[in-house]
Every structure is written in C-alpha cells, then in structure tokens.
Amino acid sequence: WQERGSDNQAGRMHVARHAPDGDTLYAGSSLGGVWKGTLDGTDWEPIGDNLYGGSHWLEVVAPAVEGDPAVVLAATDGGLVHRSDDDGATWVAPSGLDSPSGVRRLVRLRGGSDTLFILTTQDGESTLRRSEDGGESFSVVYSLGAFSGDLFADRTGSPDIYLASAEGLLHSDDLGDSWTVMGALPVAASSVELAGSEAGAPRLWAITDRNALYRSDDAGETWTWSTEVSDYWGTLNASIQDVDLFAWGGVHVQRTADGGDSWAIVNHWWDYYNAPATRLHADIPGLDVELDDAGGEVWYIDTDGGLYRSFDGMQTVENLSLNGLRVSQYYDVLTSTADPNHIAAGAQDQGYQITNTLEDGDAPVLAFDQILSGDYGHLTSSDGTHSMVYSVYPGFILVQHGEEEPWLEYLDFPADESYPWLPHIVADPDNADAFFFPAKKLYRYELDRSVWEWSVTEWSTEDFSEGGGSYASALAFSPVDSSRAYLATSDGRAYHSEDGGVSWTQSHNMAPDDHYLYGQAILASSLDVDTVWIGGSGYGTPGIYRSTDGGVTFAPFYEGIGDTMVYSLGEAPDGSGRLVAGTQQSVYRRDPVDSAWLEVTGTDAPVTVYWSVEALLHENTMRFATYGRGIWDYQFDPDHTGCFPVQDYDGDGVLCTEDCDDHDAARLPGAEELCDGVDSNCDPTDLDESDADGDGFFACGDCDDTDAGVSPDAVEICGNLIDEDCDGEDLDCDTPLAEEPDPPDDEDSPAVEPGDGGDKGGCAVVFAPGPWLTVWALAAVARRRENA
C-alpha cells in the first residue's frame, strides 16, 4: 500500500481538542480517523487509521503515568465509542455503554479530575453516563427517556454541569450524583441543544426542535427568545471569556458579538475559493472553544474543507489544513494513460481536482488543485487519457477538454428522468466525443465538433423503471468487445446487450441493490467477454454477483466478505484475472485460484470507505479513491517492472513483453537505428555504443562499422573508390596532397622515383590525425547531443 494524497485538500472535520498539557492539538474527521499535530496545525499525523468511523466527538485525558501517551476518547454520531492510551496503536470500546446507536455529546471536566460524561441514545431513549477512570468504563447517572436532551459542562475547572431534560434545565456540581432543577425549558419541545458561556452566571443558549434560539442569563432559571434559527445543522457554541459571543453553524457560521442583538456570517462560502487560507470553507459540522496558554481562548471551526482556528472570536480565521491533514473525501479518481502524472479526482464538497506533478521520495503524497467547487463522481474517459473526461455533479455533467491545459464545459441531465444523486455515466468506448447516461432510459450524448454542438439521443427504447420508481444505476461495456454491454438497476435487476446497448435482455436472476447516492459497482472482464461482476448492497444478501454466460444468469460471488456495502470492483491490468473489491471499511482481493475473497487492507492502509478503484495500466497497481483518507495505491507486485503480457501500452503493435520501451512507439524491434543515444531497434545497444568491426570506433564515429579497415585512423589508399579514413571522399592519386618538399640534403638518402611505390603507384600516404579530425569529432558529438 502507498498513500497518494491529497496533501492539501482536506475534507470534513468534526472536532478539535487540546491535550491536557496544552502542547498538542487533536482533531477528529469524518471517516478519516483521528489526527494530532502541533497547535499551529503543522506536523499532522494520523493516529486513527485503524479506527472506523472517524470521530465526531473527542476528548483527551491526561495519562495515569507521566510520560505516557495521552488517553484519547473518540465517538461517532452513530454510537461507535473507542479509547486509546497508546497513540492510536490500539482502540478499545469502553465498558458500560451497552452498544449505543447514537452519541449526542462527549465532554470532559477540566478541574483536574478528568471526569468524562457521554450522552447516548439507544432504542429511542437518551442516557447520561459518567467515567471516572479515564474512559475505561462508564456508568449511568441520569436517564432522560424519550427526550433528546443535551449537556453543557464548565470548561474552566468548575465541576458545574447543566443538562436539558424533559423535567427542565438541571444542574449538578457533584459530578452528577445529585441534580437541581434550575427552571423549565423555554418551550415545550422534544429536543433541545445547549451551549453556555462561563463568563456569565453562566449564560446559557438553547435551540429547540422548532429552530428557535433562547438565551438565559441566570443559569436556566428564566429564558428570553433571541431569534429564529435558519441554516442550522446542530452546531453551536459560546465563548468561554466573552459572555456576548455566540455562534451556530450550517452552510455558514452565524455569529453574534452583542448577545444576540445583531447577527452576521463570518464569510460567504464562495469567499473561500479566492482565499482558502483565511476564509472558511462551506458547511460547519463543529465549533469548539479552548483556553490557550496565553490566557486567551481559541475557536476551532470544523468545516467540510478542513480545520480552522481563530484567536479573535472569528473576526479573522486561519486554515490549519493546507498541508498534511490528509482527510480528502473522494468519490472517484482517474489517472491519464497518456501521462500518469495527470490525475483527476472528484471530491465531496472539495470539487473537481487535478494534479500534474508526482512528488519524489519514499512516500510521494500529491497536492491537488481544485479547479471547480462542488461534488463530483463517476470520472470516465473513452481511451483513458484526459483529452476528454466526463463526470457528474448533482445537477449537471462536467466535461474536461484537454490533457495539458484543461478547460471545462457543462451539460444538462436528460429531462424528466430518475437517477442516483450522482448518476452513473460511461464514456463511449469507441468514440472519445460521446458518452452514455443511464436513467429510466439509456441516453447517448455526442459532440459534433464541426458546429460544436452536443446531441442527446434516446439510445434504447428499453424502460428500466418497469413503470415504477427504479432506474438504471450502473453500466459497463466489455473491453473485449464493445458491442457487449451490461447494466444494473437500482432495485437489483440485471440486463445484457449484444448490440452496444440498443436492445437489452433481462437476466434470469437478481443482482445487488444500489447505493442510493452513487449506484452499483459493475466490472466487465478484460479477459472474457462473457464474464461480468456487479457489486452493491451486501446487508443480508450477497454484495457481489458474477455472470460467466454473458449476463444470462448471475450467481453470488461473495465468499469471504461479510455484511457490507461493496462500493468498487477492479481487475488487475496484468492479465492475471486478479480482482479487488472496495467496501465500507476495507479492500478485498480474489485471485482466479481462490475460493473466497481475502481482506488485504491489513495495518498498512486505513479503515475507511473505498469508494472507487481504477487499474494503472503502466504498473500492476490498483488506485483507490477513499471517502475520508484520500487516494491509496495497492500494488500487486511492488517489484514488478510494469510490463504485462497482454498489454501494448504505446500502440506500436508490439506487446510489452517483446518491446524494449512500451511507452515509446518509436522504439520497437526492427526500427531504424539512429545516432541519437537511444536504442531504437531493441538490439539492445545504440549506434554510439556499437563497434561491430572491432576497429576501436563506435558506429556513430565510423563511416563503415562492418569493415575494420575503414575508420578515422585508417590509411587512405588513393584510387580504390574507398574512403578508408572517413573524411568523406576517396583520395585521387593525381592530386598532390601538399607542396612537394625539397629533396633531402643527405646524399645517402635514397631517392624516391615515380613508380617506386609498386602497385600503389607511389601514392601511398599515411595521414596523422590533424586539426580537421578534431573538428569532425566535435561536430559528431554535438550532433549526437542535439539528437539525444
């Protein structure tokens, strides 16, 4: 497993807490575990990758032994509660909670006792429990019955706690052993949410189930109506030190600094995109206030785009998640087959993202650019490149044009149709300018580039709703034969087509139901045109079905996987037939020889939702988009060279196993070899590394590398029509090489007469390498560099 990012596009955060020593910041995410770092938001590290569900509520308790790790209590809205005393290496469920179905509040008293209180729900009843042993066990201190109440605990060291109940506003100063009714609640209600400011008596704030905000300046004895609450998502808090400062959260943070006389939002959601470092992201799941070591207080604002802090009551804010808080919530990811450095991703509320650079290092984690806000999924491309990428937002189709400098286009959904929240779309496997949109009917969109207009046609007359409320929710074409197609509906019916999706035949039996938001996972085999898998809801029924007869019948293919949702299915790119399945909490693998699925997440990958998967064709790797911990790669064979028998990546007609570079179509066996420093013909040497005739000169510096008598150092022989010395011409025997030298003075020296040279005609001359050879050699080197 290898984590790939994003390093800078954080997703939803819920809660932040200081460690008791005040030096460490802990934060809980949505399905991304628990994190800790320095107070300024640097040096983030995950301590909850082995903890499913993330953390909506969080408290940190001092260890029993000084020097040991702090004790961390993490709880989810859905009732999962766990404790760790070893920095997240292990998590244990506390005793005494009786498997709650929900958690409304988790608080810690700060007076040194570290007493914990948790308000849980189960079977429609709410119960307040207490722990005095650092969260190892809890016991009941108050039963609220069917009333959905809330708890406020003093944050300055006082033992005071306040409980909203059907009997009224209750107060205890003895850790819940006894309770005093302070007064009635402001109105009759079935639920109340509570916050308070210790700067008052205290001042308490309550929001009822009727979305009305009330204020009490006498610890709950009397209440005054303040305002009607809109854009409210159950998030509220009040300042510890400023009695008039209170805020609630929804899409925005609504804030008052004068006790409710006036209200203002901190910033609009669209302000974030021009200034993410100093403007809040939209959607506020949490607001937290902590005292700091300087005697002031710090607000933490938990958003769908990471964690922020403020030292001035949210007049200004600072983003703590621009680096290292890797809790991206991705629906899908698409890596370009033309350039694996190009990766596009669709996120929950962090938009459509791209990256064009892979970081170096042992654990390369990518940074992404958000080029459009919103929620995007089902990224699809006809040829796997980014020249045309289609995806969906809940309301329109997004088209990315261009690999290097992408630009975006928007298309409408078909009118009067039904589909999941993020509808399934599939690129036409035979036309990069077309895609399919399954709904009650199947539609095909195609771009006419001559007039730059999109046409939308009803591709098939088949009504997949069968007159009811269902619709087509997953579609796949066979990579073996694009005329063969497979489809699933939201209620688990399966269909198959043999004419590219024009006509359909329903299968004899059912497939899994869909995920209401995203549809099913559907995978057509790249090895067998008749094999297809469909994954979906596996709660009480098999989550994966397989057909090996072209979709005529399906059978369960689920052995080894328990009750869970199957979000994604993928097939290894090496032709081995190995499969992976991404589920609600982990990843499973199944090889063709296996009789069951094997869980492979282990301890190296996070326990989270593995929403989608793609096969990386240039390496034997499956890339997962997770909903909470970003992008993760699972490598089948980490040491594999990346060459698989069934692949021809560069399209030069030579399979990867026979090609010396299957990413360059100009390099293949039989190609013309050039003096360019590249082995073009896979022999496996380049001309500047070959000396076939053994004359000491490589081919690129030798005018004939098949004849050892021909080289720049050879003796030129005139008149034989052979350029022995590679100067570009044969020597003419009648052409003097230079001015005739004077006869030697030494009379004893033999005279050389014309004709004494025998059969060489007296013209044999030995040339010593001169300046011209140096110039020729330098020119040859320069040419090689220019061509390299």
PLM feature spans:
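Disulfide-rich extracellular modules and peptides
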Residues: 46, 93, 140, 181, ...
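Intrinsic disorder/low-complexity segments enriched in polar/small residues
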Residues: 67, 199, 291, 303, ...
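A cross-kingdom C-terminal cell-surface attachment/processing module
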Residues: 768-785
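Extracellular calcium-associated, cysteine-rich motifs in secreted modular proteins
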Residues: 641-760
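Short, threonine-centered small-residue motifs that mark membrane-proximal processing/anchoring sites
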Residues: 760-770
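Beta-propeller blade termini and top-face loops
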Residues: 1-640
